[in-house]
Amino acid sequence: MLRIIFLGTGGSLPTRNRNPSAVIVNLKGELLLFDCGEGTQQQMMRAKTGMMSLSSIFVSHFHADHFLGIPGLIQTMSFLGRKEPLTIYGPEGTKEFTEVFKVLGYCNLKYEVRGVELSPGDIVEGKNYVVRALKTEHSTPSLGYSLIENPRPGRFNREKAVELGVLPGPLFAKLQKGNPVEVNGKLVKPEEVVGAPRPGRTVVYSGDTRPCEAVLEASRDADVLIHDGSFADEMAGWAEESMHSTAGEVASLAKEAGVRQLVLTHISSRYTDDVGPILNDSRKVFENVIVAEDLMELEVPYRPD
């Protein structure tokens, strides 16, 4: 399972419908949080994501709308008896901010919280995935992130295995795990009955940024690109000045990268009552686009073999 839950999809100013930035990814039961704006823990409760399975927080940058939810979240998990360590990853300044988070409100955390500063190209290795930090273009030190699931084993050729004398049961399982088996004095190797590894899924999270080369390259053939889509195209001048992106700009990037699904987030408060201009500008260029809404969920399927 790879499920994306959009906890906060608003821009710099929260609105009645949109919380500040926060996106959680549930990858086979492990929770990864990308940005943690004010009110994120309540959104997690509303979405019923749980929080004790949260292993890491990836902060794109330290503007307030992307991190103010962290102090309350880490304190709540301490009150609930969390013992497992939590790592907060982010750009320059992450260690210093993390030390501040840990002492706000005189909270005596009952578990370890550590801050790790990443540079573009750095890789965080998980159980069955990696997260790669990307150089982005914003007005403060900033990073985007590419979540890349490990390749899956190739498809098992049952008919070929039987043809080679392997009976269904434990020997099938051994071959599927990459181990050779012996049948009637003959060695059957996994590569004889298991196809080439199949690619895992890729989700790219831009954080706040102008359209940039690093996000483009990371998004090539990605399953999902979650990108700053703050403004409609008519606001191109202000988007450039404030170091954000327009819907049309991001759609062009997604089209060039060959993304399967584009999701626009960090929606400016000027579109509180109507995201039509953003959606229309993006769909002129790239059809498979969604403007994210708070508590929206997106399942990311495996690609057909």
Curated annotation (Swiss-Prot):
Cofactor(s) needed for function: Zn(2+)
SMART domains assigned to the protein according to its UniProt record, in alphabetical order: Lactamase_B
InterPro entries in the cross-refs: Metallo-B-lactamas (IPR001279), RibonucZ/Hydroxyglut_hydro (IPR036866), RNase_Z/BN (IPR013471)
The EC number(s) this enzyme carries: 3.1.26.11
Pfam families the record matches: Lactamase_B_2 (PF12706)
Keywords noted in UniProt: Endonuclease, Hydrolase, Metal-binding, Nuclease, tRNA processing, Zinc
Cofactor note: Binds 2 Zn(2+) ions.
Residues engaged in binding Zn(2+) 2: 65-66, 208, 266
HAMAP family per the UniProt record, alphabetical: RNase_Z_BN (MF_01818)
The family this protein is said to belong to: Belongs to the RNase Z family.
Quaternary structure, from the entry: Homodimer.
NCBIfam families: PRK00055.1-3, RNase_Z
Name used for this protein in its record: Ribonuclease Z
Gene expressing this chain: rnz
